[in-house]
């Protein structure tokens, strides 16, 4: 099995080259779609722009929501990935609900 070439995507999921990806990647403010602090937890949703789906038949997963426990040096306690900005925004809101209800531990 060979290595798959890295695939880059813009905010709308359209393929782009690495130069365009670097342009979109910095500064972080333009790729961060959600950031909330809830008690000792931080919920963050960002555009990655790289396909993190390791299933060759699946959709590119280019957005990510993570929950961090800031009382433990920002240790991540949950991670979900999405194909679209809409899924990521909805997932961010769902993660906020999970943290508020302390359901994040069941990811």
Which residues make up each language-model segment?
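Acidic, low-complexity intrinsically disordered regions
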Residues: 17, 43, 94, 100-103
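A short, charged, amphipathic alpha-helix used as a generic interaction element across diverse proteins
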Residues: 83-101
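Short intrinsically disordered terminal tails
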Residues: 1, 100-107
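Short aromatic-glycine-(Arg/Gly/Cys) micro-motifs in beta-strand/loop hairpins
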Residues: 48-78, 94, 101
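Short, ordered coil/turn segments that flank beta-strands lining enzyme active or ligand-binding pockets
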Residues: 11, 70, 86
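Short, exposed beta-strand "edge-strand" segments with a Pro/Gly-rich flavor and a Y/T-containing core
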Residues: 11-16, 77-83
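Short N-terminal "domain-start" leader segments
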Residues: 1-62
